[in-house]
């Protein structure tokens, strides 16, 4: 009897289950239908908890991302504020451009007609600029200890500098055999030679080409001025901030930041002082000074000019070609 009752109950369950599936009344999945009610509710609660935790973590991540972006925005703005285009342009000025800028009249846009030193001074700037960039050096002094002015200029690297004038001078020095001395190269690049076979070494229109470089860098502008019978291209100053920073740098080197030791000075700044003096434009940087400051500045410049280039070139951490150019102008 019990056996028949169990069979009857089983068949009834099967019939009810099949009817429920066929009519689509059962909304509980098959795997959850066999679970007790408390287990099903627990699963639903746990799944809801996981969803809430996932959503909370997403919201927190979004907030962190937004806050991170807000933190980066002021930093970017600070970096942009710190980037001064004037400073960037000043750092790109070569020694030749700095010397020419000191010699140019701000409004007129040309150098003094009576200045016959700036031409050779600019050629000396080219040699030092190439030496500071690792393109030129002096030959070894040897056992006999040749003097600076007797040693030849050697091409250390012929890699382009990106400056047309410097690359042109570098090509001349590289292709010339036998090599020439510093004094000879200053004369050859200036065209001051009696040998007609060496006139092709002369670099032409140097001041005009340097002025055009300064125009491209936003320091100068280009104008035409009429001088009685002919027109002349001039380059008046358009960005006075750069020139003022240059003048201030030269003044501070011999006043507030004077170190009384040329080897503790920046090599480029030291070369600028020497070559600006040799080009007869250094006093233009000292013109705004008071009388006491002017006297002190010129006194310290004279101290630099009285140095012995031969002895200074033998000291550690020095540039021999720089002192060779100084010797060529101060001999």
Where are these regions (language model features)?
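Leucine-rich, amphipathic alpha-helical/linker segments
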Residues: 173, 177-206, 253-283
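Short, structured motif recognition centered on aromatic/hydrophobic residues
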Residues: 126-130, 134, 210, 214, ...
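Acidic, Ser/Thr/Pro-enriched low-complexity segments and adjacent helix/loop capping patches
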Residues: 195-203, 217, 223-225, 231
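Short hydrophobic beta-strand motif reused across regulatory alpha/beta modules
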Residues: 136, 219-220
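Glycine-rich, aromatic-bearing surface loops/beta-hairpins
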Residues: 236, 240-331
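Short, amphipathic alpha-helical interface elements at domain boundaries
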Residues: 2-202, 308-331
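Accessory beta->alpha helical hairpin/"wing" motif in late/C-terminal subdomains of nucleic-acid enzymes
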Residues: 140-171, 221-254
